[in-house]
A protein has these predicted regions:
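Hydrophobic alpha-helical transmembrane segments of ABC transporter permease domains
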Residues: 20, 73, 121-166, 247-258
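Helix-loop-helix
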Residues: 46-47, 151-165, 239-307, 312-313
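Alpha-helical transmembrane segments of multi-pass membrane proteins
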Residues: 66-85, 132, 136-143, 164-188, ...
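Short intracellular "coupling" helices and adjacent cytoplasmic loop segments at the cytosolic face
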Residues: 86, 94-118, 122-124, 198-221, ...
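ABC-type nucleotide-binding domain
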Residues: 52, 329-564
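Transmembrane helix-loop-helix hairpins at lipid-water interfaces of multipass membrane proteins
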Residues: 15-73, 153-158, 272
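An intracellular "coupling" helix at the cytosolic face of ABC transporter transmembrane type-1 domains
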Residues: 9-12, 105-106, 122-131, 135, ...
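Juxtamembrane loop-to-helix connectors within ABC transporter transmembrane domains
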Residues: 81, 99-145, 232
Length: 564
């Protein structure tokens, strides 16, 4: 099983180097105020300036050199950290995308597209921010706080105790308020995801929204989601706003208390240099604390996003291994269902003890009412889902023994609503076999399906970059036929192949099925009898079973056609 922890651990040595640099830089930053303290003590002494000139020059030189070294180390740390973080994020995004591509259809059917988009964009960016900026800042701040407390204990143990007690007070406050902040941030992210889902639904259903005049209802629902998001965000920042004054009050209280103790003579052996050192360390002590409070939101976002990416990667049960099984070079189209039963995600049964066979080279119509299970049978043939019981065989081989890569390589599936990739027309036809097709062969296929004239209207011909909006529904179906012909398989499955096509092109498609694919096994999901002229067999799906019909069962009633 792949998880986020394994990916991060691949970079552990690179990040250990960053941690080492953080510790060295923190040590240097702790040492710098001490140099200034020594300089102040030297200047304030009764010694003549000429006598301390050499020592003063040495202290200033040490300070400048140390500062320069610190700057160089900071540069190295930032460069290494940025490179490591970018490599890590690239690795996470690449691994996550591969994982999504390997999901089985059952997993996809239970997920929103916007959820996947959010995981691949916002969540991975949050992880990058968390690992590349927030976590190093917290580590640096934590190391520096410990070093400051150690040095302060040597300067004056009472001062160190005061700072430790104050730190405990601040930590308790942060944890108490932070618990609420974590809840508010989690709810805000969940609501934002719902809002993203709603955006996608809004744009997909825009025509329906206008047809039924429900713009106001949709608008109100958007306002409800936005208001809920605003409410959680406001509560989060209200809680966060309490932390800053708490930090400031604690800081000023400590400085005031220490100065008071010094002025009242409660602390022995305190000079101006020591007071500077103490005040400087207090400032430096609260600066990282302030950073930690200010970036507390990033911790919450990072933790939530890491959990969500881990959830997305899931377990191996969600994964479809297309290479598992026998690599069969050619399937001839002998398909047999034996006592097949199936239900989606253990829900209501769709098919029960289904039995039928399709022979090599047969043309078979798959008919039935909407929701009867026609598409389900096709999904099972394509290996998108595992059956609950029974057997499906191809040329006598069990479907589970054939690799999905081999299975799908031998089947062309023409969907009712084909997808057009944002790529060239040629790439949209050959998909993953571009090197084996000359331009002339692609043009011949376009002429065969009746799309050639359309393509000649494009400036770059078959190399024109197209997308979903470049073709009408009917033209998309013709493009899908071109894909199927280019794939050149032994089994073809058509989902209502002429539903979006005019009469002229409908006849073209029928000719292709009859002539071009005459030696192939053809399965046609059909709702109209005209679609399945010249088929050899009709399989009707009804009552979770498959009944074998003949073409004589197609009757004409009042110039309309229906299946019986």
């Amino acid at each position: 099983m792949i998880n986020l922890k394994k990916i991060i651990l691949k970079y552990k040595y690179k990040f250990l180097l960053v941690i080492l640099l953080i510790i060295i830089i923190s040590l240097i930053n702790t040492f710098l105020p001490y140099i200034i303290k020594q300089t102040i003590a030297l200047v304030k002494s009764d010694v003549v300036f000429h006598d301390i000139k050499q020592k003063l020059f040495s202290l200033v030189s040490v300070y400048l050199i140390t500062t320069l070294i610190c700057a160089i180390l900071e540069f190295l740390k930032s460069t290494i950290l940025a490179k490591n973080t970018q490599d890590l994020i690239y690795d996470i995004r690449k691994t996550t995308y591969k994982r999504i591509m390997d999901f089985n259809m059952d997993t996809f059917s239970n997920m929103h597209i916007s959820t996947l988009v959010t995981r691949m964009t916002s969540d991975i960016s949050n992880i990058g921010e968390f690992i590349g900026r927030t976590l190093p800042m917290f580590l640096s701040s934590g190391v520096f706080l410990i070093l400051v407390l150690i040095v302060m204990s040597f300067v004056n143990i009472y001062f160190a105790i005061i700072m430790i007690v104050s730190s405990i007070f601040l930590v308790v406050a942060v944890l108490k308020i932070g618990k609420k902040m974590a809840y508010y941030k989690k709810r805000e992210i969940e609501i934002t995801e719902n809002l993203n889902d709603y955006f996608g639904e809004t744009f997909s259903s825009i025509k329906t929204t206008h047809i039924f005049n429900i713009q106001n209802e949709r608008r109100q629902k958007f306002i409800d989601y936005s208001s809920a998001e605003l409410s959680m965000s406001t509560k989060y920042f209200d809680s966060q706003s309490i932390l800053t004054p708490v930090r400031s009050i604690t800081r000023y209280f400590i400085i005031s208390l220490i100065l008071y103790l010094c002025l009242q003579g409660k602390v022995a052996n305190i000079d101006i240099g020591v007071i500077y050192l103490v005040v400087s360390y207090i400032d430096k002590f609260f600066e990282p604390l302030g950073n930690m409070l200010y970036h507390y939101e990033d911790i919450q976002k990072g933790k939530i996003s890491m959990h969500r990416i881990d959830e997305l990667m899931g377990t191996d049960e969600n994964i479809e291994n297309i290479y598992q099984g026998e690599n069969t070079e050619k399937l001839y189209g002998n398909i047999k269902f034996s006592n097949v039963s199936f239900s989606y995600s253990n829900k209501k049964s769709i098919l029960e003890n289904v039995n039928f066979s399709i022979n090599e080279g047969e043309r078979v119509a798959l008919i039935g009412e909407t929701g009867a299970g026609k598409t389900t049978i096709v999904n099972l043939i394509l290996g998108f889902y595992k059956i609950n019981s029974g057997n499906i065989t191809f040329d006598g081989k069990n479907i589970d023994d054939i690799s999905l890569e081999s299975l799908r390589k031998n089947i062309s599936f023409i969907q009712q609503s084909p997808y057009v990739f944002n790529d060239t027309i040629k790439k949209n036809i050959v998909v993953n076999n571009e090197n084996n097709f000359s331009d002339e062969k692609i043009i011949d296929i376009l002429k065969l399906v009746g799309l050639y004239n359309k393509v000649t209207n494009f400036k770059n011909g078959i190399y024109e970059i197209v997308n979903e909006n470049s073709f009408s529904k009917g033209e998309k179906q013709l493009l899908a036929f071109a894909r199927a012909i280019a794939k050149d398989t032994s089994i073809y499955i058509f989902d209502e192949p002429t539903s979006n096509i005019d009469v002229k092109n409908e006849q073209t498609i029928k000719n292709i099925i009859s002539e071009v694919l005459k030696d192939s096994t053809v399965i046609i999901i059909a709702h109209r009898p005209a679609t399945i002229e010249n088929v050899d067999k009709i399989l009707k799906v009804q009552n979770k079973k498959v009944v074998i019909k003949s073409r004589k069962n197609i009757v004409h009633i009042n110039n309309s056609e229906k299946f019986t």
